[in-house]
A protein has these predicted regions:
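Beta-sheet repeat architectures centered on beta-propellers
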Residues: 1-143
Length: 143
């Protein structure tokens, strides 16, 4: 009808607003798989991880140190674990982990040959920008 128009405002806010209803805009990002090789010095294993992985060694993750440059609301972190390349990723039995702006670290116990990190949110008024995440990783031997 005459006189009716719509105004669309893009790239503002963190929620979807439609017909006065506010809903979350879900977001997620998943890293690629990474694995480790045990460092060898003069032919002897050092039990230290070398991040130039070959998928031969099991790795143990004991801690996640999240780094969000800007975070409002809660964010979910999940470790996706695989022992073989064509295997379906399994989530760590202790996760997923809810991260708040005051979370400094998350203690966990995860073991796998390769691990990917998934970060997501599904709640209203949530936004985040990634920094550099850190994981405490140790070589866990061959299996």
């Amino acid at each position: 009808t005459d006189g009716i128009s719509y105004y669309y405002e893009h790239e503002t806010g963190v929620n979807q607003i439609r017909l006065n209803t506010i809903t979350a805009i879900p977001a997620d990002i998943t890293s690629g798989d990474y694995d480790i090789t045990q460092k060898v010095v003069r032919g002897a294993a050092t039990n230290m991880a070398d991040l130039r992985g070959d998928g031969e060694n099991i790795m143990r993750v004991s801690r996640i140190v999240p780094d969000f440059i800007n975070q409002s609301g809660n964010t979910i972190i999940q470790l996706d674990l695989r022992d073989y390349p064509n295997e379906t990723a399994a989530s760590s039995s202790l996760g997923p982990f809810t991260i708040t702006s005051s979370t400094t670290k998350v203690d966990t116990r995860a073991r796998a040959r390769s691990i990917a990190l998934t970060i997501s949110n599904t709640a209203v008024d949530t936004s985040w920008k990634l920094g550099t995440f850190r994981l405490d990783i140790q070589a866990g031997g061959r299996r």
